C-alpha cells in the first residue's frame, strides 16, 4: 500500500481552483522531498556512520562515479575493487547496503541527490571535502 496518492493531479478539463504562484517564488524553493526518499537518505547516513575506513573509501569511489558519470577513471577504479574470488560467496551486509544505495540513488532527482550530499556534509564534512576534491581531480581526465 502506497503512502502517497498517485491521483493528485487535476484533469486538464477542469479549471485550476488554486491561486497561481509567481514564477520567482515557485522556482526559488525545490519541491518537498518525499517521505520515502528522506527515509532512504537517513538509512544511508546511519549505515555510513558504522562503516570502516576502507568501506567509506569504496563508497567515496562510488559516489564520485555517480557524480561524474561520463568519466572513465572512476569506473576503472570501481572495477579495480571487484574481486573474482568474491563470486563464490554470498554478499556481505556492506555489499547489500551499497546495492540498496545504488538502487535508491538512481531513483532520486538531481535536487534530492544534492540534498543527500548536503546532509552528509553536515555530519561528515571531511568526507565530503574529499568527495569534492576527488570530483575536481576528474576534470580533464577521460
From Swiss-Prot:
Record carries keyword GTP-binding: no
GO cellular component: cytosol; mitochondrion
Superkingdom of the source species: Eukaryota
Mitochondrion is among the record's keywords: yes
Localization: Mitochondrion
Assigned keywords, A-Z: Mitochondrion
Listed PANTHER family: CHROMOSOME 14 OPEN READING FRAME 119-LIKE-RELATED, SIMILAR TO 1700123O20RIK PROTEIN
UniProt protein name: Uncharacterized protein C14orf119 homolog
A Pfam entry, by short name: DUF4508
Lineage, top ranks: Eukaryota, Metazoa, Chordata, Craniata, Vertebrata
InterPro entries associated with the record: DUF4508
Organism: Mus musculus (Mouse)
Amino acid at each position: 500500500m502506497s503512502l502517497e496518492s498517485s491521483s493528485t493531479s487535476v484533469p486538464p478539463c477542469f479549471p485550476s481552483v488554486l491561486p497561481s504562484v509567481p514564477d520567482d517564488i515557485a522556482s526559488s524553493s525545490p519541491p518537498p522531498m518525499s517521505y520515502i526518499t528522506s527515509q532512504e537518505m537517513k538509512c544511508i547516513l546511519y549505515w555510513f556512520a558504522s562503516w570502516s575506513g576502507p568501506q567509506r573509501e569504496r563508497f567515496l569511489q562510488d559516489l564520485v562515479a555517480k557524480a561524474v558519470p561520463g568519466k572513465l577513471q572512476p569506473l576503472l577504479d570501481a572495477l579495480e575493487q571487484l574481486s573474482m574470488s568474491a563470486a563464490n560467496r554470498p554478499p556481505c551486509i556492506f555489499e547489500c547496503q551499497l546495492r540498496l544505495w545504488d538502487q535508491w540513488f538512481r531513483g532520486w532527482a538531481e535536487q534530492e541527490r544534492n540534498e543527500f550530499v548536503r546532509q552528509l556534509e553536515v555530519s561528515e564534512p571531511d568526507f565530503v571535502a574529499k568527495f569534492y576534491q576527488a570530483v575536481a581531480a576528474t576534470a580533464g581526465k577521460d
